Regions:
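Positively charged, polyanion-binding regions of nucleic-acid-associated proteins
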Residues: 6-25, 90-107, 133, 138
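A short, conserved structural fragment
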Residues: 56-59, 63-73, 133-150
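Amphipathic alpha-helical oligomerization/assembly segments
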Residues: 180-215
Length: 217
């Protein structure tokens, strides 16, 4: 892209793509619903606390760049918003899902991307994820994804989106001399984190449903 997106714009775009894929019955999103989607605690790294003024400012900027469109649905006075990422950036549905996960959760390995994109769209294998990522990296106008250099102690390379410009690899250095028991503890920790994410996601969905209902009261 000619001008990199801001952190807020990146979060807005990711949230819109996510909601289109996971809860199409509530999409497009009102400003309130979009703000809640940006701020939800599940499937977000980092978790943010934007107000509506911050979100609408990002939306207006993205409208000028043909990344977001305002829509007025029949019978409703509430303006809603949908993304135009697939059209403007030329993304397939699978590529859009990967860009969504990258914008919402930062740099990730292929395995992490496959696991986290499952709730958006199905990838049959890790090779399918890698193929889609290679396509995003091979674009000439310009590439949307980069592969970060593998750091000492890491088995897999991580990938990051380039919508906000070049990426600074500031992940903490991995601990050296890891044992089998520490790896097992990590796996248990990841499972526990996954369960916690699911609980938070259910709570966020309930909150969004309540906000949606209030629009008709």
């Amino acid at each position: 892209m000619d001008t990199p997106l801001t952190a807020v714009e990146t979060r807005v775009l990711g949230a819109l793509i996510e909601k289109e894929m996971t809860t199409p019955e509530y999409y497009p999103l009102s400003l309130n619903a979009l703000t809640n989607a940006c701020n939800q605690s599940s499937n977000r790294e980092p978790v943010v606390d934007y107000d509506e003024a911050t979100v609408i400012s990002a939306v207006e900027s993205m409208r000028k760049r043909s990344l977001v469109r305002a829509v007025q649905q029949s019978g409703s006075r509430v303006t809603k918003y949908r993304h135009l990422a697939s059209e403007t950036l030329g993304l397939t549905e699978h590529q859009a899902a990967l860009m969504c996960v990258l914008t919402l959760r930062g740099p990730q390995t292929l395995a992490e991307l496959k696991t986290r994109a499952t709730r958006l769209i199905d990838f049959e294998s890790l090779d399918d994820v890698e193929t889609a990522m290679n396509q995003l990296m091979a674009r000439e106008s310009p590439p949307l994804v980069t592969r970060l250099e593998r750091r000492p102690g890491q088995k897999e390379a991580r990938y990051a989106h380039l919508l906000a410009g070049e990426v600074a690899d500031d992940a903490p250095e991995p601990a050296m001399g890891r044992t089998a028991s520490s790896s097992s503890a990590d796996r248990i920790g990841q499972l526990e984190q996954g369960l916690d994410d699911l609980r938070k996601e259910v709570a966020d969905l309930r909150s969004q449903l309540e906000s949606f209902r209030k629009q008709f009261e």
